Each structure stands twice: as C-alpha cells, then as structure tokens.
C-alpha cells in the first residue's frame, strides 16, 4: 500500500538548523543519563574528600562503612577502595568503550591440527614457554606446532613418517645450512605418498600460523604426470587441485603456465605437474617468478649437469628442492656430485673443488696399482664425503616391505640353447667379425664389439631376431643359412627354436590352466615384444602392450584396464626402456625378465612393478638367461657391481665401451656343456658337484648375493610348482638360483583382506634352521 505524502501523515519536519535533529523522546533519555552521570561523579568526589579529611565523618553512601574512628579502620577502608590492577606488563584495560564494531580482535594462535591427538605426526615443536612468558609476548609472533593432516598421518607407515619428517627438516633448513634433500628409497616404499604429505603440509600451515609455501612444481617423466595427479586425488580425496600439463596446444600451455607463475596467492591449482621435456621447453616462463618448492621424480635423470634439463631446473627460483630416485646411489662421483649439487648448490663446493678434495683421491685409491697410503686416504675421503651428504640423503631398502606385503620369490633360470641357437652362436664366435673385434682396441673396434654383443643377445632370445642378418649374409652369418630349417617362417613363431621361449611357453600354459594369476613380460627390445605378441595370439591369450610408441594418455588407461580383476587381459608386455619406472602393475603377481640389462638398476626398476603396495598375492619373479652365454656374463657383472658398490654406468652411455681386451675375450667365450657359468665362477663351497649340500644362512633373502641363494641343478626344492613342472616337461632348464623375501609368508586371501586384523598363517615351506655359516660367504663375494 502506498504511503500518503500529506502533512498529517508525515513525521515532524527537521528544523532548519545546522544542528542535527534529535527526536523528543531521545532528548529526554539523553538528559536523564547525563544527570545520573553527574550525580555519580559528585558522590565520588565527596568520598575521596572524606577519606582525606580524617576529622570529618560524613554520612555518605560509601562502598565500605565503618563506625570506629581509628587509623586501622581507615587503612582497611583505603585498601578496599583501591581499584584492581591486572598484574601484567603493559596491560591496557578495555571497559568496552574503545571497542569499535567491525574491527577484528586479536586472538591467540593455534595449530591447524591437534598436536597431542592419537597418531599425530608433529613436524615442528615451538619453544616451550611458561604461562608468564607467554602473557608478556606479542600474540601475533607466537610460534605454533606444525602437525600433519590426520587424513594422511593415520595411513602413513613408520618409515614413511620418518621420511616426511626428514624431508620437512631439510627443506626448512633444520638439519643444516641447506634446503634440499634426496629421497633415495628403493621402489615400492611410498615416495609419492611421502611427497604428497609434504606438499599438503607446506601449502596449509607453518610455524608462523600461515602457509609455508603458496605453490609447488612436480617434475617427472611424461609417463608419470597423470599418475601424480591420481596420487594427489587418491590420498587427499579431492581437497587439492593440481594443474597437469599434458597435451594441449602451445598457446593454451603458455597461458596456463603464465597464470600459474604470476599468481602469488590464493591459487586455485597450487601444484603444477609437468614433464621434464615440457619444463625444458617452457623454462623461460617458469623461471621468471619464485616458487615455493620443486620435486623432481626419477631424479637420476639429472646426474649429468651439462644437459639442458638440468640447467633449466637449476634456473628455477626456489631454495626448496627434493629429488626422488629409487635407483641405488653408487659411487660414480661425477653423477653423485651432480645430484647433491642440484638439491643443495655449493654444499660440496664447485666441481673443481670437489674433484680436488674428493674425486681424485678416491679414484686413485681404487686403482689396482695404488699404494697402501693411497688406499687409506681414499677410505678417509670416502667417509668424509659420506658424512657430508648423509645430512641430506635418506635411503631405505625394500626389506621394510616384508612387514606389509606378501612373500616374493625370485628365481634366476639358466635355460639351455637349442641346437639351432647353439650352432648360430658358435659360428658367430668363430667368424672373422669377432676375431677383428678382439684384435683391435680403438674406438671403432669397440663400437663393432658392441654390435657383436647385441647380436649374441638376440641369438639367445630367438633366431627370428637375426633372420634378416642371416638371409642378407651379413658378416658373421655368411654360412648360417643352411642352419635354419627349410620351412622356416618368421610369420609363424616357433617356440621350439629357442630354449627360453620354449620354457616361457610351457610356464604360461601352466599358469593359465592353474588359476587366475596374471603375468608381466619384460624385455629390453621391442622386437622381442613382437615375438611375445605372436605367441599370445597363437595361444589365444588376452594381452596389452606398452612401449615407447604408446601415448601418455593411453598408458594410464592400459594400466588401469590390466589391473582390473574383471579384465580378460592375461599378459602385460612391457618395454623396460619405456615403462620401467613408476608403473604399478599389482594386477599381476608373476613377472618374467626375459633378457638382462647391463645396468642392474634398470632391471631392478622393471622387476619392482608387481611387488608393491596393494599386492595381495605371493609374487614370483623369473629372470631368464641362456646357460653359459653372453647373458650370464651380463648377470655376473650386475652382481659384481651391486656387491662391491662399484661405479654405475651412465644410462646414456653403453657399458660395453669401457671393456678392455681381456674383458671382451671373456665375454666372447662360451662353454656349451656347462650348467651355469655363474655358479662355476662362484666356486660355491655349499655345493658338491653342482648339488647343494648346505642351505644358505638363515639371515639371507633375495637381496643377498647370489652365492647366498639356493642353488638347484634339478627341480627338487623349488618354491614354484609351475617352474618345477616346466623343468620336467620341456627339459630346457640347466640350473636355477632362488630365494625369497622373508622367512614367513603373509597369506592375503579375500576373506582376510576384508577383515580388520588378518591372521598370519605360517609358511609351509619354511627353511630349516642351519648353523651359522663359515667365512666362505665373504670369499664368494669376490667370485666374479
């Protein structure tokens, strides 16, 4: 209803005056309050006057009345009339008159999460203050606890809690005058989860009661960018949004990176996930502005300080650097320096200073002709170097996983060459091609020897891999065409032409018929993967394949599909060069490493794909080598490097180039009648005529040296019935080394997995106790 504007319907008009208008009722109330205040002030003056005048006693409304006119009573009255004073320095009372509506009051600081809660992980403890000291402090400068979000701390295992605390102390400079660290845990220990915890904690809180960083960058191989996004989503349950840079046009990428770099606070996606290649291309944008922290996954890519990726990352404006690498850090001093210098520049000085102080002395002591004094100095310098870098490096082995994962059986299988393989192998060794490689020592001859070694490895796998060389009558195969059958056809794979393929075919058939286990097949060559594919089609096995030709987006879908229990994929064919790092293939519990790599770290990365968090079944790892061949020589060199912690060979540099003439002569020797060249060179004292008479020591497992594994020249005592049956059926196995991950198997069936406290069943194949071993084990370490 519309109000009338008639004078009778309107309120009193505001008088024409410069004074503000006050309604009559408010005028009356205001006047009464003023009179009351004046009366109170007058009474207060009279009370004070009465107390000062001792001879005057007035009948006033005093707070405390007294009748006796004595000094004592007057003193008491004076004390009781005194106003209360708060016993705090610089205390200013506030009776409400100084408060202003809308101004935020100063409140006491509190940690984001309860530091005394059950299972709390406290990364920073503030100094302990007394209550009196705290009252005298500026409340805006009081430090608080830094406590990991219970969402994460409740699922972290003890070694992961230790790792998170170590990384936090390093990046915050609590362990020394540096802000970087290297997380060198072996595969499967949860490096990703530990980093997710660190990033989330730094983005959310700090001792100053505010976030420590406002954004972070995670750099990884392109195949793992999507995996990092999944890990953040999985563990934080969508509480943190990431910015994955994969695919997209150049314009969109530049726009997204510029927005990420320029925004300093309240960023919707505070974590950038980017590949090494993309970072190198757009380094100019990312290096313009500061960033809170950078994490480099698979950090062994940065062991060459001269490459462009290393230099681009060094230009990033951040002091907090974390490097992740499951590859064992061995004493290749140049790459060792590069890794440490990346996370903590100048910790070891310049490259020239490092070489003068450490590298020269250590390498001189490793020479075979070094003096006793040089060897002693090398030991001293090595210990000094370890003492420095141990401040920023943490490394735990996957022995920790034995508490949480099912048992793992690892087997090295020596398979016999077939008659065709044997003839091709010996003919090539006797050819003029190999003789010339052994006669020359120049660089050109070394490259030729490298090609010859690759040819021998292909003969060990299957004759199909060298069929083109045979038909073209290349050097070394001039007279080999008559070795192959007349009906030889490469389009129809014949497993009987290769000892390893025949064994693989038997074992896959037994696994398929025996249960619902899935299998991972790994090779260093895509040509071998082609043969795997032919075998799978021939036997009608469902399979998926991952190699360097597969796009990054498709890789994630392929892995997820294979891990799905409802999937019909039986085989996962994997190129170790394309996907040996970071993949989680827990859908399978059996893995075949079909051919060995010169670098033991590459094989270990590839073989760690199935024995990981989430695995519920016992795992079986099969490493296949051809008996007495070049593959056994490679295996021996792997073991030698691991046991003696010798120099690891750069991934981009062929190991064969470093061989001397004597080394090459050993590589090109072959004994067709030997069961295992590796076992012969061990000079094992636990075996008599290749039959084991004394078991390994009780405290050994599959991480121990091969000399401390079980040695089998027949199928008795094998931990795997599938292998034992295949040994009998195909008659192509000559020797087996095997061991397990732990002394007691953890059986994880569906019913136990569903329960909160699964019951552990004793291992039926438990090894009998043996007396302590003699000193021969130490001598065996020098067998290669």
UniProtKB/Swiss-Prot annotation:
Enzyme Commission code(s) on record: 3.6.4.-
GO MF annotations in UniProt: ATP binding; ATP hydrolysis activity; ATP-dependent chromatin remodeler activity; DNA binding; DNA translocase activity; helicase activity
Location(s), subcellular: Nucleus
Region (Disordered): 1-54, 751-784
Predominant cellular place of this UniProt entry's protein: nucleus
Feature: compositional bias, Basic and acidic residues: 36-47
Residues bearing the modification Phosphoserine: 20
Acidic residues compositional bias, start-end: 775-784
Positions occupied by motif DEGH box: 297-300
PANTHER family per record: DNA EXCISION REPAIR PROTEIN ERCC-6-RELATED (PTHR45629:SF7), SNF2/RAD54 FAMILY MEMBER (PTHR45629)
Family per record: Belongs to the SNF2/RAD54 helicase family.
Name of the molecule in the record: DNA repair and recombination protein RAD54-like
Species annotation: Drosophila yakuba
Gene symbol of the encoding locus: okr
């Amino acid at each position: 209803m519309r109000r009338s504007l008639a004078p009778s319907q309107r309120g009193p008009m505001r008088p024409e005056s410069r004074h503000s208008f006050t309604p009559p009722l408010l005028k009356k109330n205001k006047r009464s309050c003023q009179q009351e205040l004046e009366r109170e002030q007058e009474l207060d003056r009279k009370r004070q006057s009465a107390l000062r005048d001792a001879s005057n006693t007035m009948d006033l409304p005093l707070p405390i009345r007294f009748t006796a006119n004595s000094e004592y009573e007057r003193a008491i009255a004076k004390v009781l009339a005194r106003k209360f004073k708060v016993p705090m320095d610089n205390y200013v009372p506030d009776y409400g008159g100084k408060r202003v509506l809308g101004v935020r009051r100063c409140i006491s600081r509190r940690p984001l999460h309860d530091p005394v809660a059950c299972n709390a992980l406290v990364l920073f403890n503030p100094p302990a203050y007394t209550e009196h000291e705290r009252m005298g402090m500026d409340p805006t400068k009081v430090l608080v606890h830094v406590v990991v979000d219970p969402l994460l701390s409740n699922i972290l295992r003890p070694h992961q809690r230790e790792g998170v605390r170590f990384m936090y102390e390093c990046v915050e400079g609590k362990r020394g005058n540096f802000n970087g660290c290297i997380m060198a845990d072996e595969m499967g220990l949860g490096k990703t989860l530990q980093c997710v915890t660190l990033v989330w904690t730094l983005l959310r809180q700090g001792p100053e009661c505010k976030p420590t960083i406002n954004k972070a960058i995670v750099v990884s191989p392109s195949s793992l960018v999507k995996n990092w996004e999944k890990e953040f989503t999985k563990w934080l349950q969508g509480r943190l949004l990431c910015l994955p840079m994969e695919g997209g046009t150049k314009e969109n990428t530049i726009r997204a990176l510029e927005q990420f770099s320029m925004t300093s606070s309240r960023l919707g996606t505070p974590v950038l996930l980017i590949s090494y290649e993309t970072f190198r291309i757009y380094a100019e944008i990312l290096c313009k502005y500061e960033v809170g922290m950078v994490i480099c996954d698979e950090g062994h890519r940065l062991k060459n300080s001269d490459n462009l990726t290393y230099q681009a990352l060094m230009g990033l404006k951040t002091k907090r650097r974390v490097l992740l690498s499951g590859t064992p850090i061995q004493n290749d001093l140049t790459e060792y320096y590069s890794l440490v210098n990346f996370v903590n520049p100048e910790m070891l000085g310049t490259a020239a200073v490092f070489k003068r102080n450490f590298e020269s002395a250590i390498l001189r002591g490793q020479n075979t002709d070094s003096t006793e004094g040089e060897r002693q100095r090398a030991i001293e310098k090595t210990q000094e170097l370890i003492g420095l870098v141990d401040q920023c490096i943490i490394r735990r082995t996957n022995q920790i996983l034995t508490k949480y994962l099912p048992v793992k059986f690892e087997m090295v299988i020596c398979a016999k060459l077939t008659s065709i393989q044997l003839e091709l192998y010996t003919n090539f060794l006797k050819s003029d091609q190999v003789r010339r490689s052994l006669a020359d020592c120049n660089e050109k001859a070394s490259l030729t020897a490298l090609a010859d070694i690759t040819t021998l490895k292909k003969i060990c796998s299957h004759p199909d891999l060298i069929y083109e060389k045979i038909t073209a009558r290349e050097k070394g195969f001039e007279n080999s065409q008559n070795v192959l059958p007349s009906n030889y056809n490469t389009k129809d794979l014949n497993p009987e032409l290769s000892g390893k393929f025949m064994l693989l075919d038997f074992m896959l058939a037994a696994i398929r018929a025996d249960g619902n286990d899935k299998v991972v097949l790994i090779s260093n060559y895509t040509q071998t993967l082609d043969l795997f594919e032919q075998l799978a089609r021939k036997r009608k096995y469902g399979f998926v394949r991952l190699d360097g030709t597969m796009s990054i987006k498709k890789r994630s879908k392929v892995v997820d599909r294979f891990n799905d229990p409802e999937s019909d994929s039986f085989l996962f064919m994997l190129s170790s060069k394309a996907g040996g790092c970071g993949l989680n293939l827990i859908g399978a519990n059996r893995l075949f490493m079909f051919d060995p790599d010169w670098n033991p770290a590459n094989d270990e990365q590839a073989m760690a794909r199935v024995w990981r968090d989430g695995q519920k079944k016992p795992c079986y790892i099969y490493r296949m080598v051809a008996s007495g061949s070049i593959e056994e020589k490679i295996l021996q060199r792997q073991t030698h490097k691991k046991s003696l912690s010798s120099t690891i060979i750069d991934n981009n540099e062929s190991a064969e180039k470093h061989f001397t003439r004597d080394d090459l002569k050993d590589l090109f020797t072959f004994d067709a009648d030997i069961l295992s060249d590796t076992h012969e060179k061990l000079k094992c004292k636990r075996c008599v005529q290749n039959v084991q008479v004394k078991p390994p020591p009780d405290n050994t497992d599959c991480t121990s040296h091969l000399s401390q594994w079980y040695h089998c020249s027949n199928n008795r005592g094998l931990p795997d019935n599938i292998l034992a049956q295949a040994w009998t059926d195909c008659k192509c196995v000559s020797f087996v080394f095997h061991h397990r991950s732990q002394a007691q198997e953890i059986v994880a069936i569906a019913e136990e997995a569903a329960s909160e406290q699964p019951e552990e069943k004793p291992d039926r194949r438990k090894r009998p106790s043996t007396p302590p071993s003699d000193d021969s084990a130490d001598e065996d370490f020098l067998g290669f």
